[in-house]
Amino acid sequence: MQHTYGTFGRMSKSGSIKDDEKGPYDPVPIADKANDEIKLEAKMSLLNGITVIVGSIIGSGIFVSPTGVLKYTGSVNASLLVWTASGIFSTVGAYCYAELGCMIRKSGADYAYIMETFGPFLAFIRLWVECMIVRPCSQAIVALTFSVYVLKPVFPDCAPPDDATRILAACCICILAFINCWDVKWATRVQDIFTYAKLLALFIIIFAGAYQLFTGHTQYFTFDNTNTEVTSIALSFYSGLFAYNGWNYLNFIIEELKDPVKNLPKAIAISCVLVTTVYVFANMAFYTTLSPVEVLGSEAVAVTFANRLFGMFAWMIPVFVALSTFGAVNGILLTSSRLFYAGACEGQMPEILTMIQISRLTPTPAVLCMTMLSMLYLCSSDIFALINYVGFATWLSIGVSVLCLPWLRWTQPKLLRPIKVNLFFPIIYILATLFVTIVPMYASPVETGYGCLMILSSIPVYFLFVAWKNKPTLFQKGVVSVTKFLQKIMLVVGKSKPAQV
């Protein structure tokens, strides 16, 4: 272990402190690295990568309300086909992301790909919606679900108090924020353990369903009442694809994955196949015991299923749902903080978010920023509406990211591509993405209008804070002072070298 005498080094153009500047913290330990390089470390193995993806995809939805697909398809067999097709569709998207991730090895995933391909303006729109609304809202919602299931045994006959639910959700987020600030290995261990727990719960449900199936409980597996309207089909796929959301999360932290060219495609392929199999079999298990009417009317399908079959052991499922949501909160925080970090590295968010803690080598400011935004959304009474308004933007941005693949083939054919996808797959994926986003937008014009307004709010922010370079001196000095102060509080510096492109 070596020490640096002084804090953080050279002054950047914006005035933040860098590695060799004399400062008040003397000495400061830093990691034993060649040239004492301060950067995010590649600590994640293939198994860690798989658990990040699986743990991020599987939240509470499959346990609580896997009903959206059934609602729009109208029949059990049609819903199972949509679940399967959605898994295949997500795997195709992940296959395209494997080429992009191995070619553009930057944290930030689709944000980084859009930045490299279409420039800063479109990339900022994606960054704004995802960082300011989608990610913190999603984390707050999953944390609230965790709280409800933890408190349910304490309040068996009524809904848990709202204040208690929100306080416990805040505690959940804060604990995981500490873990993510302390050590990436700790965060990945949490992800591993809670991913195993949720898979164990789903395998219990699947095995119980298999027993029911082999004993002749097949009366609900029909195509009766199947809805064949185009709008209904699109909405059913929209619901199914939403359940698979998270397959691209490993791309957000690719700088911390060991041997990404080898491990990224493997992790994506294994995770997508595993999740698709588990989702389809879990849904089949539910319908061996519950009718479509019971599934649509249940507040928590897995709990109703367990009460019907497991008797005195039915309490296990709510516990596993709580464990599942805790792991999902960790997955969102782990990957989302890297999106803040990636945006700041491109100069589109405050410079402090590029900083790395000098002894723990974690993006502490980015983790804390994500945590604070989630806390703010916990104070809102209508966070579910916010996430619904901009949900279509997520799929549009993923479609634009996949469009980067053929575009870069055309404009930069000499880029090194360790993986080369057949262009048939991105073209099919882009067309399907347009179908499952435009039709629901037509079906829900009011929500779409609100969502578009939220997206358009990024434009004045971009021109005021990103595109405008010659800001008043007083403003710049204020930003420098705040950045230096936060650096000293958190003991963070900017990384030494840029990511590979």
Regions found by a protein language model. Name each.
Residues 16, 35-40, 79, 157-164, ...:
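Helix-loop-helix junctions that connect adjacent transmembrane segments
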Residues 70-74, 78, 154-163, 184-194, ...:
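Transmembrane helix-loop boundary segments of multi-pass membrane transporters
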Residues 34, 41-144, 241, 250-251, ...:
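Transmembrane helix-boundary motif of multi-pass solute transporters/channels
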Residues 1-43, 405-425, 446-501:
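Terminal cytosolic tails of multi-pass membrane transporters
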Residues 148, 196-224, 284-288, 398-415, ...:
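Hydrophobic alpha-helical segments and their helix-loop junctions in multi-pass secondary transporters
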Residues 82-86, 154-184, 202-205, 363-373, ...:
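Transmembrane alpha-helical segments of multi-pass small-molecule transport proteins
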Residues 68, 90-173, 177-181, 186, ...:
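Hydrophobic transmembrane alpha-helices that form the core helical bundles
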Residues 110-113, 119, 152-157, 236, ...:
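TM-loop-TM module centered on a large, flexible mid-protein loop between adjacent transmembrane helices
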